[in-house]
Amino acid sequence: YIQLREAGLLEAYQSPELTDVPEAYQDEQGVWNPIYIGTLCFACNTDWFARTGTPMPTCWDDLLSPALAGQIVMATPKSSGTSYTTLATLVQMRGEDKAWEYLKKLDQNVGAYYTASSTELVKQVSTGDYAVAIVFYHDGRRAVLDGYPIEVRSPADGTGYEIGACALVRNAPAGERENACTFLDWMTSARG
């Protein structure tokens, strides 16, 4: 949204439904409207951890355990917003040099490849192909609600987040602006 705003492709519109949303999660320029916050977490296959007796990770450094060699799945930050958020989080928490050192160590525990997108990660952990996926909390929680042997764990030493948003496109057909505003109001409401 920031790039679209800077390119002048979005029109300022702030839904009246945002009165209960803290300003820290809103766009200072009033262009995009927040609709959710997604925090990074570890989606862990409880069957795998019970079978191996390996402790479930509680912090980022736990992912470096030799017991998790080849058992972590994540997407590449080149194409995945989830993994880009992971990279940015680690840089903010540890500083750039220490973050890259950490990622080199983590790479030793990542399975055969990095996926292009994070959409498949929870499925791979749900079916037992891997023990841990680094994903957004809502993706892991969905697997829990669907009955998979998943436990969602937030890193105790801190984590990153994304703000999902929606915005009004500039120069949309004049007759559709009112409908678009109504939709944005619904998306930012408790019902949306």
Locations of regions flagged by a protein language model:
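Periplasmic-binding protein-like
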Residues: 38, 102-107, 114, 146-170
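Loop/turn elements at helix/coil->beta-strand transitions in domains of secreted/extracellular proteins
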Residues: 68-72, 98, 128-131, 148-150, ...
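Extracytoplasmic ligand-binding site segments that recognize negatively charged/polar headgroups
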Residues: 1-126
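Structural recognition of the beta-strand scaffold that forms the well-ordered cores
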Residues: 34, 41-43, 71-75, 131-135, ...
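Bilobed periplasmic-binding protein/Venus flytrap-like ligand-binding cleft at the lobe interface
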Residues: 58-66, 165-192
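Alpha-helix capping/helix-boundary segments
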Residues: 121, 139-140, 192
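A ligand-binding cleft/hinge motif common to bilobed small-molecule-binding domains
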Residues: 1-3, 131-149
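A bilobed periplasmic-binding-protein/Venus flytrap-type ligand-binding module shared by bacterial periplasmic
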Residues: 43-48, 87-88, 163-176
